[in-house]
């Protein structure tokens, strides 16, 4: 076991954010921080096949006011059973797991190695928060690369020293070690794993604070980040927070396609609340910027809520002009409105 202690995190907001827990669905928001375990593995292969095993498991956790890191290293594959047994004993007191792609890679690999060694899986009841999925959701609109190292650079503004090595080199370095027994190159692997754990913990803390206090960040997030968080709020039925962030993202400036979509999403909430003036203002803003879907919403409003068929017809015509392809539904709506205006009584369903 290799341990690094005394990594201070006291100055950071240490809590399990309610929104972070809400997105995690099964994850409780009242977990003790001492029960949270950050995990990352380095393996003998990158594919995760039956012959792949973890030779280094990094674990991060809070011990009172300090964040500590312990690394379990497997010096020889034939010692895997005792390696896993020691690991199991160490993690038995934790009940929440935080990983980055751990649901798809690290945990299934660890479980399969336990099965091959006739051991019980180490996390049968632990709650699991995989930050990769949340990172993809929040930053897919402006970051093409959502790897942990990319998030370190672009979101956390952290940098690694020259000790670090690319992840793809790690399996071969370990295999070289097994042949030569020269452990000196492994120092870079230990550093890489240590930084992954520390970055994972930093990302966890940042996300918890960002999701609960998105407008109170020391570095103002990108407008696309506010938009993405607003969608997350909306999907978890935190509508007031969603509306606040939709407004902030529109004021911050968005690429036009995202701007129009945000106007529609924001207006939809107002429509559900029957706050027609605010909904109309957003639809009109989007319509003025060439959005046919908002024109259709305005046509529906004027026909069904106000009974102003001329306005409904006008907005339908504008929707047709802004649509780049022939839409039978719009043509049907146009003809129906013309018939109603001309006094015909034929009724068509929406």
Name what the model sees in each region.
Residues 2-10:
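Single conserved hydrophobic/aromatic residue that forms the stacking wall/gate
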Residues 66-158:
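Conserved DEDDh/DEDDy metal-dependent 3′-5′ exonuclease domain
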Residues 233, 270, 302-303, 338:
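Residue at a conserved register position within TPR or TPR-like alpha-solenoid repeats
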């Amino acid at each position: 076991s290799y341990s690094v202690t005394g990594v201070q995190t006291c100055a950071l907001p240490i809590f399990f954010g309610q929104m972070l827990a809400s997105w995690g669905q099964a994850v409780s928001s009242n977990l003790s921080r001492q029960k949270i375990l950050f995990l990352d593995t380095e393996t003998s292969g990158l594919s995760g096949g039956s012959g792949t095993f973890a030779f280094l498991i990094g674990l991060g956790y809070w011990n009172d006011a300090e964040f500590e890191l312990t690394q379990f290293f497997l010096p020889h594959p034939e010692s895997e059973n005792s390696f896993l047994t020691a690991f199991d004993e160490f993690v038995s007191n934790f009940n929440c797991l935080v990983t980055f792609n751990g649901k798809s890679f690290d945990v299934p690999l660890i479980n399969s190695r336990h099965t091959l060694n006739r051991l019980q899986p180490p996390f049968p009841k632990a709650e699991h928060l995989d930050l990769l999925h949340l990172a993809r959701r929040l930053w897919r609109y402006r970051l093409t690369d959502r790897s942990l190292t990319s998030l370190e650079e672009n979101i956390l503004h952290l940098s690694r020293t020259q000790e670090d090595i690319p992840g793809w080199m790690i399996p071969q370095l370990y295999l070289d070690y097994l042949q030569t027994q020269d452990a000196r190159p492994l120092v870079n692997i230990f550093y890489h794993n240590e930084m992954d754990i520390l970055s994972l913990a930093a990302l966890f803390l940042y996300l918890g604070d960002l999701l609960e206090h998105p407008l109170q960040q020391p570095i103002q997030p990108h407008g696309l980040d506010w938009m993405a968080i607003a969608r997350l709020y909306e999907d978890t039925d935190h509508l007031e927070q969603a509306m606040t962030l939709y407004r902030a993202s529109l004021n911050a400036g968005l690429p036009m396609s995202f701007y129009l979509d945000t106007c529609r999403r924001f207006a939809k909430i107002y429509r559900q609340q029957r706050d027609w003036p605010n909904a109309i203002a957003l639809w009109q803003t989007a319509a003025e910027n060439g959005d046919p879907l908002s024109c259709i919403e305005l046509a529906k409003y004027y026909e069904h809520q106000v009974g102003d068929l001329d306005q409904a017809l006008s907005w339908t015509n504008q929707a047709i002009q802004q649509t780049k392809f022939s839409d039978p539904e719009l043509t049907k709506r146009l003809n129906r409105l013309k018939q109603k205006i001309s006094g015909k009584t034929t009724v068509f369903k929406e």
